[in-house]
Amino acid sequence: MRLLLILVLLTPVIVAFSVDEELNNADGANAASFTADQEVRHKRNLFPAIARRGLDVELKSDGCPKYCPPGISCCFGDNCATSATSGKMECLKNPRQFV
């Protein structure tokens, strides 16, 4: 009986989230299909803890941080190195090519 009551109470919440997700995809994209940009954002969930803390972080097109000042880590596979063009510490895929 309790299980049925819990199910009945949770159904409106589940439906509300489903409708909200469809409204967010009102630009013509099907809710089941990801664009390439959405797929990248979906896969990058190693980094968003910093973004959730409210730090102003500039992101690259792949969703990883562009610069690596103290307190900001690069995504997996990136390394923090000084860029030859800007002179700033940047998260780079292959930093040896910029040194």
Swiss-Prot record:
Compartments where found: Secreted
Ranges annotated as spanning the membrane: none
MF term (GO), any: toxin activity
Protein modification: Contains 3 disulfide bonds.
Name the UniProt record assigns to this protein: Teretoxin Tsu6.4
GO cellular component, one term: extracellular region
Keywords for the protein's UniProt record, in alphabetical order: Cleavage on pair of basic residues, Disulfide bond, Secreted, Signal, Toxin
